[in-house]
């Protein structure tokens, strides 16, 4: 008997919607990354994108534990000399709440072309409205 290897054209991808209200950021991101990779499926193959599409709503209501709301810092660079910027978790939630979940999940995915393809299947929205109703996403309770 040979080892099963999934083929990209035969992978069945489902759509799921996840409500981030009150969920802990790291625990939520871990499960999202796992499902984007497809590790929850029996047909998981490391070099093939077998994951599902995931729509995250209410990203602005995601929670962190302890003092991370004020102590956790996000850094980025503008590209100019001396252009290093930083913002706390609280400031990031106020400015761009989707980025908090996107950054957390992106760090948990493989680096390279396959990881970027997996990341493109993650859709994050700050509010409760999303524009993927045509895909009929199933509610996923994490």
Swiss-Prot record:
Q: Which residues cross the membrane?
A: none
Q: Which Pfam families match?
A: Ribosomal_L13
GO cellular component term of the entry, any = cytosolic large ribosomal subunit
Q: Does the keyword Nucleus apply?
A: no
Provide this UniProt record's keywords sorted from A to Z: Ribonucleoprotein, Ribosomal protein
Q: What does this chain do?
A: This protein is one of the early assembly proteins of the 50S ribosomal subunit, although it is not seen to bind rRNA by itself. It is important during the early stages of 50S assembly.
| Subunit structure comment from the entry | Part of the 50S ribosomal subunit.
Matching HAMAP family, A to Z?
Ribosomal_uL13
The family assignment reads: Belongs to the universal ribosomal protein uL13 family.
**Name this protein carries in UniProt:** Large ribosomal subunit protein uL13
> Which source organism does the UniProt entry give?
Histophilus somni (strain 129Pt) (Haemophilus somnus)
Lineage, opening ranks: Bacteria, Pseudomonadati, Pseudomonadota, Gammaproteobacteria, Pasteurellales
């Amino acid at each position: 008997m040979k080892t099963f290897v999934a083929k990209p054209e035969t992978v069945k991808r489902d759509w799921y919607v996840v409500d981030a209200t009150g969920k802990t950021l790291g625990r939520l991101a871990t499960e999202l990354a796992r499902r984007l990779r497809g590790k929850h499926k029996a047909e998981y193959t490391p070099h093939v994108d077998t994951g599902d599409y995931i729509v995250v709503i209410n990203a602005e209501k995601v929670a962190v534990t302890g003092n991370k709301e004020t102590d956790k810092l996000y850094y980025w660079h503008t590209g100019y000399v001396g252009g290093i910027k930083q913002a706390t978790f609280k400031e990031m939630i106020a400015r761009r709440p989707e980025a908090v979940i996107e950054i957390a999940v992106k760090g948990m995915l493989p680096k390279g072309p396959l990881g970027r393809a997996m990341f493109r299947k993650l859709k994050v929205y700050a509010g409760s409205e999303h524009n993927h109703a045509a895909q009929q996403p199933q509610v996923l309770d994490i």
